[in-house]
């Protein structure tokens, strides 16, 4: 199982939100690349990077910071937020981003996602509120069940699904293991858990399923409730 530390970018700074609300943003660093460098030094191989401004604007908004992170680390980067067309995908691939996360567009235009997955390294972000898919930076809820959307991308060439329980995101209330497993089973695709991770027990629970491919760690690191180096050791030895 892979642990992916997270950096959310807002106005060029590293922040965390609670339940996806922009007004809840708490700034953790004015220099996100330094945070990424620290993750690398702690033993991380991947970075989960989100352009929050981009998610709401529908186009890249933190390019300079993304370039800085790419230039200063050798981490593999998966990036989401405002990626709605092939031009943006190509721009990020040219920057050296390893994997791109398509979210809202996966609900509106799954055929586009499948076409992109045939050409580029694509992950689908499935964000859910009470089991139903949330779109537009979590500002709206759709009538589609998260498991149905996951099933849509089975055998599509999509590399991974990142599933977020929006109600838990940034709350440190514990990860939703059952939801993550349901997405993995519905899709047959490597599934990465996101939202609510608090401490090492969450990592152990996910690892024990044997079906979860990865977990994103955000606020638990920034608030000190999870020892990231301990978590890396656990998954490497497990």
UniProtKB/Swiss-Prot annotation:
GO cellular component: cytoplasm
Name of the gene: hisA
Organismal lineage: Bacteria, Pseudomonadati, Campylobacterota, Epsilonproteobacteria, Nautiliales
Alphabetically ordered keywords of this record: Amino-acid biosynthesis, Cytoplasm, Histidine biosynthesis, Isomerase
The keyword Amino-acid biosynthesis appears for this protein: yes
Protein name: 1-(5-phosphoribosyl)-5-[(5-phosphoribosylamino)methylideneamino] imidazole-4-carboxamide isomerase
Superkingdom of origin organism: Bacteria
Top-level EC class: isomerase
Pathway: Amino-acid biosynthesis; L-histidine biosynthesis; L-histidine from 5-phospho-alpha-D-ribose 1-diphosphate: step 4/9
Molecular function terms, GO-annotated: 1-(5-phosphoribosyl)-5-[(5-phosphoribosylamino)methylideneamino]imidazole-4-carboxamide isomerase activity
EC number(s) recorded for this UniProt protein: 5.3.1.16
HAMAP family for this protein: HisA (MF_01014)
Family: Belongs to the HisA/HisF family.
Organism: Nitratiruptor sp. (strain SB155-2)
């Amino acid at each position: 199982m892979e642990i992916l530390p997270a950096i959310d970018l807002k106005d060029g700074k590293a922040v965390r939100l609670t339940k996806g609300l922009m007004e809840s943003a708490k700034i953790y660093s004015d220099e996100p690349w330094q945070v990424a460098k620290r993750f690398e030094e702690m033993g991380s191989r991947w970075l989960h990077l989100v352009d929050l401004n981009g998610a709401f604007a529908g186009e890249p908004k933190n390019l300079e910071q993304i370039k800085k992170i790419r230039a200063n680390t050798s981490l593999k980067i998966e990036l989401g937020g405002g990626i709605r067309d092939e031009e943006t995908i190509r721009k990020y691939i040219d920057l050296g981003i390893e994997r791109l996360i398509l979210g809202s567009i996966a609900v509106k235009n799954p055929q586009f996602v499948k076409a992109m997955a045939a050409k580029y390294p694509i992950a689908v972000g499935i964000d859910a509120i009470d089991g139903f898919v949330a779109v537009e930076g979590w500002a709206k809820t759709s009538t589609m069940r998260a498991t149905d959307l996951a099933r849509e991308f089975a055998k599509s060439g999509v590399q991974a699904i990142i599933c977020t329980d929006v109600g838990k995101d940034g709350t440190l209330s514990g990860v939703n293991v059952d939801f993550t497993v349901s997405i993995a089973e519905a899709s047959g695709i490597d599934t990465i858990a996101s939202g609510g991770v608090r401490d090492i027990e969450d990592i152990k629970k996910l690892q024990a399923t044997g079906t979860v491919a990865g977990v994103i760690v955000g606020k638990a690191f920034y608030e000190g409730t999870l020892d990231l180096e301990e978590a890396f050791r656990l998954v490497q030895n497990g």
